[in-house]
């Protein structure tokens, strides 16, 4: 006889159990089968129930909680268990709500298990706002309170109280229960109402397939509005308890209005969230302050954190203020972020009329905040602080504050509201989703973009809600990817199912990744694409900003000159040409990248100039369209460095070098020495010296563009930049000298062979191969007569060649200048331009001063006749590296000269703390210190016969002449000051040594130095810290331990 509980059928000789296995039901627990049998569900009649169970977020948790409920009910009476079981079988909607709740929220399941009689509430629809008010207020026996405020003269005034006898509205009530009893009643009622809302919400993301059916999905805005209504009701009851605690049965002698802020104010509250509030009291005396404080304490003890930190002056400000005091504060003292917070303000409970008066008075100020001078800087600083508060390791898991997170959407939407809401009152709405919809409807953002963002935002909020519901705790952090169990639960509770070999968790991960990427691109979608649509030809029904709205938006996005910026956009993207259409497609993304630079105005202008310069190059726009990295790099350069921008605009073909090759950035594929060889070879093909110098300029321009671009993109170190700049100068000098010699010997009226060999000796930074962008070429010329040529005739010929080269290089052009400076030669500017080795030797032996000998420490051959240059260097070694080292008199003289430099050379009005060359602990301090150490120890250590500051520092550290910490301090300061000096040239387009004060110009320098432009204050602090430490080492090493006494002796 067949077992009636297990029907079987024979299939090809095998017996198949028609009941699903626990594995098929997604049950992992070893007790699952036994639990199902205990419930009476392990039978054919219960198959729908088992499949329903398998749809829960965590079926094992749901099963465990269900068993506990049955056990509790059975302990009460068999009939109680049977009633629940029959309702589960008969009522599909209830079944889904119950199982979705038990498998989606452990905390809510625990509440239901502890109070099993509440299960019948899950058969009902969602409580209305009025019903929630009634439930919360009835839980503490509330009735409308008598509010009779007393003014400063002691006069009583009757005011309207929106509290009602049927307990369905916000207002000022008085509770019967107080203390612990009240808190217990409030907590229970609040948790029960939340449980009902959660069950309906979770049932809406329950999986729907052939084996089970979900319930209607509850719209996100409906969920958040219900939760906000619940918070309103809960805090209205908390205020009733506070009234009794402060006043007892006496009339309330103050009007107290509670303004909801943040998500609660916008009626888009989470399940578990702080509720931000602001209090207005009339009068604001000690009792109204006590009432507000008791309200906060009761709310925090019973429901959630109630936070009044958004009030004027924050936590240090008065807890309650009069309306007049609020108005005065917002008119005079409020910061931009405080007006941004007021976007969400809403009268919540207490005196609703006073709350509305607050909104009427303060609200208009919100819509003028975007006109404040500091608005853009404030907005950027607020966003930066948000990101800084998220640890790097959590930025991809944080739903709220991380990359592509909720705050990105909220921040962007609020910015658009504040910019355009001044003139467009339809934007004066509180909730993010409603604001996004209005932005779409009014044409501020594209319809598709806007709707995609709404969906993305609501999806992130859904995940946030599910995470919070699980333990009823405030959280915004996703589980780690490797936490498969929690990822699986979250995915299932959020409505994801596995398919095609992909698990539900994987499906959720992929969708989340897409959403984050979409949100990360929202600045292009929300801010820049509408701007472009305002200047291109569109159909009348297409989304399009007005010209005035577009200019307003440009100003809010950081453009200092929005009218000009709009003109640039019009010039670039208007018209019907193919190029204009491509520009209109590209510019939203390009402008997003420009917005991350220190000077987007200049960047947009430079892009317009470059587009004009590259007009006949068909590949230009195509490359920007197809190779995103080219556009991104180009915008960083154009918005950061006028110096580099001009180089690129003059050589548009260079843009192709900003892409990637097979081994990485193309900018790094070209070795500096190969560039120099190519430069010399190209110049050598020209007999005309003017054309030769023109060719040298052109190739130098390309190399400067390459080095500066790589520098701005953080692809080269400071040493690599300086070395590359030095090599190209060497090549220009060598090629130019050869060109002049060719020209001199080609003249029929002059000798056809050179009358002298000429060598160019690099001095200063050129000699040390440490040139910056703004450095001149300090040189000396050495000549040697050709065999059989009179010395005077040879020197005169060499002088004419060298002077001709200098003047030809110095001719004005659109390129960075090519100044050759002879100021370090013997006798300075009054000395001979060219000398023989013997003449130099005689001069240094008889008349050479200490400063001239010190200058020789950096002398090296850079161009011309190498053999002659080598002999010259060997000759001067006895002067710069004397056998016994520098004399005491020379050391005293060096220190005396340095003291004069410190006291006299700093330009009038310069800041000694931030002057990169002559400032405290800056380049001059470090280089003089290194040169003094060379003079003292080079006779003992041949490794110090080196012209490079950094390489000498390495040697003095290795030899123990200074300790490693001192060497590292000087090294870091030299690199920092050199990078800052280079950045100044990149930003100003000419040589500069003084860092600007904090502000926009310093932000530009910080950006060029590799820092985030918004972090210009941190950049300045770093510079000051590094140079301060450097100065301390200079005091110890250059001046001696007793530096004050050392200088006094001078």
Curated annotation (Swiss-Prot):
Gene3D superfamilies: Beta Polymerase, domain 2 (3.30.460.10), Nucleotidyltransferases domain 2 (1.20.120.330). Its EC number is 2.7.7.89, 2.7.7.42. SUPFAM superfamilies: Nucleotidyltransferase, Nucleotidyltransferase substrate binding subunit/domain. InterPro entries: GlnE, GlnE_rpt_dom, NT_sf, PII_UdlTrfase/GS_AdlTrfase. Residues 1-531 are annotated as: Adenylyl removase. Its cofactor is Mg(2+). One of its GO terms (molecular function) is magnesium ion binding. Coiled coil: none annotated. Pfam families: GlnD_UR_UTase, GlnE. Residues 537-1050 are annotated as: Adenylyl transferase. One of its GO terms (biological process) is regulation of glutamine family amino acid metabolic process. It comes from the Bacteria. One of its GO terms (cellular component) is cytosol. It catalyses: [glutamine synthetase]-O(4)-(5'-adenylyl)-L-tyrosine + phosphate = [glutamine synthetase]-L-tyrosine + ADP; [glutamine synthetase]-L-tyrosine + ATP = [glutamine synthetase]-O(4)-(5'-adenylyl)-L-tyrosine + diphosphate. Keywords: ATP-binding, Magnesium, Multifunctional enzyme, Nucleotide-binding, Nucleotidyltransferase, Transferase. Involved in the regulation of glutamine synthetase GlnA, a key enzyme in the process to assimilate ammonia. When cellular nitrogen levels are high, the C-terminal adenylyl transferase (AT) inactivates GlnA by covalent transfer of an adenylyl group from ATP to specific tyrosine residue of GlnA, thus reducing its activity. Conversely, when nitrogen levels are low, the N-terminal adenylyl removase (AR) activates GlnA by removing the adenylyl group by phosphorolysis, increasing its activity. Belongs to the GlnE family. PANTHER family: BIFUNCTIONAL GLUTAMINE SYNTHETASE ADENYLYLTRANSFERASE_ADENYLYL-REMOVING ENZYME (PTHR30621:SF0), GLUTAMINE SYNTHETASE ADENYLYLTRANSFERASE (PTHR30621). This is Bifunctional glutamine synthetase adenylyltransferase/adenylyl-removing enzyme. It comes from Corynebacterium efficiens (strain DSM 44549 / YS-314 / AJ 12310 / JCM 11189 / NBRC 100395). The lineage of its organism: Bacteria, Bacillati, Actinomycetota, Actinomycetes, Mycobacteriales.
